């Protein structure tokens, strides 16, 4: 099994240095993500899509960490979708299951990864999700409108997992049809494949804003000392 890490984004909403290269504890966020997957026995390969101008630097840094799971660092594309495409091409041939995980989502627990893996083995595609908890309303800049039902609404997380041939086909179709999507689930659903929802955790958040970064720094000591506390027992219902 392989995990693809699209890490070529610039982190404009957070500002400053791209979030995946900021230090969280003793290592950059990207390294913490890779360490999470290195601890999982089913994951044998990791491919990172880095900024094109930083491929050599990122390769040197990751190799210096002694990460046995690291297979390749490739140049990313102009957006997340193209970065996943580039990383997918570097996956070794024998691999038939592929996970895609955000480079700025460091608090993914082993039990959550395993749940996605099992769902992919059963049905072919799966993603971590968290039910929407907040009240939702339509509206514009001037006034609030009606409440939107939260029933059946989910916030998408990663990892998202797929049979390799499904994901490859989905990206080929997207390129042929000039289809853009914000995650790989949408591309696979475009092929009429079902994607299984797997309970995620609110702690498995993506670092996007300054508030997210502050929260990540606050949670880091707990994750460092006892990452099992972040497993499915700390899921969206908690």
UniProtKB/Swiss-Prot annotation:
Pathways per UniProt: Isoprenoid biosynthesis; isopentenyl diphosphate biosynthesis via DXP pathway; isopentenyl diphosphate from 1-deoxy-D-xylulose 5-phosphate: step 2/6
| Gene Ontology terms describing biological process | isopentenyl diphosphate biosynthetic process, methylerythritol 4-phosphate pathway
One Pfam short name: IspD
Keyword field contains Transferase: yes
Enzyme category, top tier: transferase
Do you know which CDD domains this protein is assigned to?
CDP-ME_synthetase
Per the record, where is site Transition state stabilizer? 13, 19
SS bonds (residue pairs): none
Record-listed E.C. numbers? 2.7.7.60
The record's catalysed reaction(s) read: 2-C-methyl-D-erythritol 4-phosphate + CTP + H(+) = 4-CDP-2-C-methyl-D-erythritol + diphosphate
InterPro entries for the chain = IspD, IspD/TarI, IspD/TarI_cytidylyltransf_bact, ISPD_synthase_CS, Nucleotide-diphossugar_trans
Q: Name one GO molecular function term.
A: 2-C-methyl-D-erythritol 4-phosphate cytidylyltransferase activity
Which of UniProt's keywords are assigned here?
Isoprene biosynthesis, Nucleotidyltransferase, Transferase
Keyword Nucleotidyltransferase part of the UniProt annotation: yes
- The site (Positions MEP for the nucleophilic attack) lies at 150, 206
Q: Which family does it belong to?
A: Belongs to the IspD/TarI cytidylyltransferase family. IspD subfamily.
What role does this protein play? Catalyzes the formation of 4-diphosphocytidyl-2-C-methyl-D-erythritol from CTP and 2-C-methyl-D-erythritol 4-phosphate (MEP).
Which named protein is this? 2-C-methyl-D-erythritol 4-phosphate cytidylyltransferase
UniProt source species:
Salinibacter ruber (strain DSM 13855 / M31)
Tell me the organism's taxonomic lineage: Bacteria, Pseudomonadati, Rhodothermota, Rhodothermia, Rhodothermales
Gene name tied to this protein: ispD
